[in-house]
Amino acid sequence: GLGDVYKRQKKETMAKSVKGTRTEKNLLTSFAGESQARMRYTYFASVAKKEGYEQIAAIFTETADQEKEHAKRMFKWLEGGMVEITASYPAGVIGTTLENLQEAAAGEHGEWSLDYPGFADVADEEGFPEIALMYRNIAIAEKGHEERYRAFIKNIETASVFAKEGEVVWQCRNCGFIYTGKEAPQVCPACLHPQAYFEVKKENY
């Protein structure tokens, strides 16, 4: 099965050790970056919830879980021992949801456009093609994260999180009630949860 393919791939790659390579440092650097992003997004989710943005809170939480998986893939290539790295990380504050989205989008942009392509090139140079491929594939996910954050930034800036130009179908995240109109109901008539729980209905199945 697929699991065996991955195990075999890892065995083949790990015939060559990452110990002492630039790739080893890059793996640890990006593991730390993904781990910190996961924590920041968890904090940002709490703020979004408090500010009445249930969908944005859920997206921050979902993205945090995805960063956890990226971190795990990176960590699994490492071989133990202590490794010293020099890297810069956001020593930022927890802001408003708009500020948090902007911070998150900028971080994702840096990863997919600069950091991970660079790490992939180094991995290729050092003879770790599977690690290079991992970085390039994770960069695709990070680009998707950035685009999603930018869409929410636009919604907040144009006050269109719960109101749209034309009629749309809104769905309550709590109970599934469906409503068609330009603006989400102030209160869900079915479960009495506030407007915060409404989002534009998605059909992706």
Regions found by a protein language model. Give the residues of each.
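Non-heme di-metal
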Residues: 10-205
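Short, small-residue-biased leader/transition segments that mark boundaries at the very start
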Residues: 1-6
